[in-house]
């Protein structure tokens, strides 16, 4: 949301509750988050971005579907707005994604590459969890969780990976994966889209 606002988009958001540090971060950037209500979409926005925590029955999701509003999931938006033409470095695995992605972004930053990054936390040494620059380098924390109720692929398959770091794999997310083998299949789909000139680092 903050990165899109910096690009000149008008942004509004809805959630059940946002708490520090994220609420503080959004408030400092003038981004208002409201409780879910169909009135939030009455002005017919150009695009509705539906998060993966949203399921059928959510009033705003139902409104978007019923009124044929353009919608997409966040990973798809990232791909089209921020990742095309970049060297996407995707850090994934069951544990250690945030730490490893933060370290990788910091290394690129301190080597003068001014990377874009999207990390599932706010690293102390970077001051924010997301930043999109004109640099050709982008570090993404890649999550194997599903993209949205209308797209059950793992989020990381949208990230146009050029290099992938897999920290580790264990059985996780029992709400969407039935076994470790299913998780491994999801990671194999990510590996399958690394280009021939790309890189895979697997622990």
Please place each PLM-identified region on the residue numbering.
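Short, polar loop motifs at secondary-structure junctions
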Residues: 16-19, 37-39, 52-56, 76
């Amino acid at each position: 949301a903050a990165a899109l606002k910096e690009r000149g988009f008008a942004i509004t958001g809805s959630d059940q509750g946002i708490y520090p540090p994220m609420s503080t971060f959004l408030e400092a950037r003038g981004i208002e988050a409201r409780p879910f209500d169909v009135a939030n979409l009455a002005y017919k926005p150009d695009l509705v971005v539906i998060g993966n925590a949203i399921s059928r029955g959510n009033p705003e999701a139902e409104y978007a579907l019923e009124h044929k509003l353009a919608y997409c999931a966040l990973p798809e938006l990232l791909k089209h707005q921020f990742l095309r033409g970049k060297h996407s470095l995707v850090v994934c695995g069951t544990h250690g994604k945030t730490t490893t992605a933060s370290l990788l972004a910091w290394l690129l930053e301190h080597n003068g590459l001014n990377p874009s990054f999207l990390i599932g936390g706010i690293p102390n040494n970077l001051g924010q969890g997301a930043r999109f620059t004109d640099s050709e380098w982008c570090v993404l924390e890649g999550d194997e969780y599903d993209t949205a109720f209308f797209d059950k692929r793992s989020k990381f398959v949208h990230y146009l990976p050029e290099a992938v770091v897999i920290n580790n794999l264990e059985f996780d997310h029992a709400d969407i994966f039935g076994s470790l083998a299913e998780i491994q299949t999801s990671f194999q789909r990510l590996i399958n889209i690394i280009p021939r000139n790309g890189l895979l680092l697997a622990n």
